[in-house]
Each structure stands twice: as C-alpha cells, then as structure tokens.
UniProtKB/Swiss-Prot annotation:
Its cofactor is heme b; Ca(2+). It comes from Arabidopsis thaliana. One of its GO terms (biological process) is hydrogen peroxide catabolic process. Removal of H(2)O(2), oxidation of toxic reductants, biosynthesis and degradation of lignin, suberization, auxin catabolism, response to environmental stresses such as wounding, pathogen attack and oxidative stress. These functions might be dependent on each isozyme/isoform in each plant tissue. It comes from the Eukaryota. This is Peroxidase 69. Substrate binds at P168. The gene is PER69. The keyword Plastid does not apply. The record marks R73 as: Transition state stabilizer. Its EC number is 1.11.1.7. Glycans are attached at N93, N216. The active site is at H77. It catalyses: 2 a phenolic donor + H2O2 = 2 a phenolic radical donor + 2 H2O. Keywords: Calcium, Disulfide bond, Glycoprotein, Heme, Hydrogen peroxide, Iron, Metal-binding, Oxidoreductase, Peroxidase, Secreted, Signal.
Amino acid sequence: MGRGYNLLFVLVTFLVLVAAVTAQGNRGSNSGGGRRPHVGFYGNRCRNVESIVRSVVQSHVRSIPANAPGILRMHFHDCFVHGCDGSVLLAGNTSERTAVPNRSLRGFEVIEEAKARLEKACPRTVSCADILTLAARDAVVLTGGQRWEVPLGRLDGRISQASDVNLPGPSDSVAKQKQDFAAKTLNTLDLVTLVGGHTIGTAGCGLVRGRFVNFNGTGQPDPSIDPSFVPLILAQCPQNGGTRVELDEGSVDKFDTSFLRKVTSSRVVLQSDLVLWKDPETRAIIERLLGLRRPSLRFGTEFGKSMVKMSLIEVKTGSDGEIRRVCSAIN
C-alpha cells in the first residue's frame, strides 16, 4: 500500500507541475491576463523591445523616407477598425489590407522584420499590435517630432475583414469627422491634433485632383483653395492621377506645424483638412496649436497625448487575442 501511495503521490505531483507550466505558458502568450496596457509592460521579459523596434524603423526610414508616414498611417488605419490589434497586418484575400483605403499602405515589411528580430530575442512575448504602435511613435521621432511614452500590452486580434473597414474619408465634413472620432472615444482636440500628422506623407492624385479641376461638377477648382496653390498641385498630378502629391507641400519629410499653417492659408490638398479652418471649434484649436490664440497648446505634446489615446482604442487583452508568431497570419 505504501508503494501504491508513493506512485499516486508522484503522479499527482507531476500533473500539478504540468498544469503550472501550461498556465505559465498561457500567461506569456496572452500578455498579462486582461491587464490594461501600461508603460514598461514587458519589463525583464523583453528589456530591449523598444530599442529593437527603433533600430529596424530607423534603418527603413533612412533608406526610404516614405516609410515614416506609411507606418504612421498604417497605425491609424489599424486602430480605427476593431481597435489597435494589428488586424490591418493580416494577409488574405478578404483581409483589411485588401480594402480600397488600405491598398496604398506601406511599411508591412518593417513590422515583419521587427517581429522576426523580437522573436529571436524574446520568443512569443511581444505582440504585432505593440510593434506597430511603437513603430508609429518612432516614425514621428525620426522625422523630427516629439517623443512620448508608449503603453504596451496589447494582444493581436484574430479577425480581419475588408468589409469592416470604414475609415474617415478625404472629403468628409467637420461634423462627420467629429462623429467618427467621437465613436472611437476621441474628442475634437484629438481630431485636429491627429490630422496635424499630415505634416508628413502624401496622398494619391486620384483622391485630390478633382478638387483642383472640377469641384462638385463645376469645371472649376474649389473656390476655397488659394488660387496660387492650384497650378502647383496640377503640376504634380497628371491627368491620369497616377502619382502622389505632398500633403505638406515643401515639408513632406519633417514633422512640424508647417501643415497646420498651410491649413490657415487654404493650401492643403484634402477637403477634409481644409474645412477644419472653417469650423469655429476646430479653427480655435488650430490657432492654439500654432500659438495664435491663448491658452496656447504645444503641438508635439498634444500629438503624443492623442496618439496614446488612439492606441488604447478597443485593445485586446486576456483571452480576446493572441501573440502572433508572424504578423501576417494568426497562429
């Protein structure tokens, strides 16, 4: 009987150890069991996560500067559909990447490279959603913007459908933009500040050329555009609309307040940007961000705050998500 008892004790002990190891593994793959993202989330589990991501982003931005606005735009597109869960990174015939607004996204290879390096340094630890969030911050800093601390601890989503993509549009009214941002728990200050991110990057000529040649079927440019700005845009946009135009003409690779200043003089290419100067509330915010109205606001500081708010939209934690092995496919 003593021998049988000993065997039973050994078996029970073994099963308890297996359960403990399994639970520990699940905690690692589920990024904290439901805790909200916070600064320093990975701690000693992946101490170099930020430096690894920054190194990869820096290399790609130096070789192709357009990767900086590309990554920033990708992060925005990710957060506005199912929250900041890396769903825009998933490949597939009907994934978010195939939706019309996402077909011109760039920088996927940057995120995949950062993920591969992190998998070697800290296997099954850092989510693709967190990598994209860090990369967006680094893209801003590398183009001259102000740094901010990034809360980490998001999980990767498992759902990505092109039919779910419903992003703010380039011709939206101020009221529509306010409505869309409010639906994502972002206020009007966040709206104006994040639109200020158009200080870097480009837009497809096909999206904007109509405003400069046939606004609302009139056969004339939008009368609210500075007339001297029209020939500059048409020179960049051929009739077939097959190229891209700078969102912040003459300062496309520098993150600063130049774009917001151009909004005040009606020298911006997107109608959704131009109308922000016509609405009293958004106009007042622009003036404060430019130091033209008191109390003034620091654009760099406010941009970081709004990016953090956006990065916490509908984050996945606990059993709601996973940590992908590669960013383009669920496990």
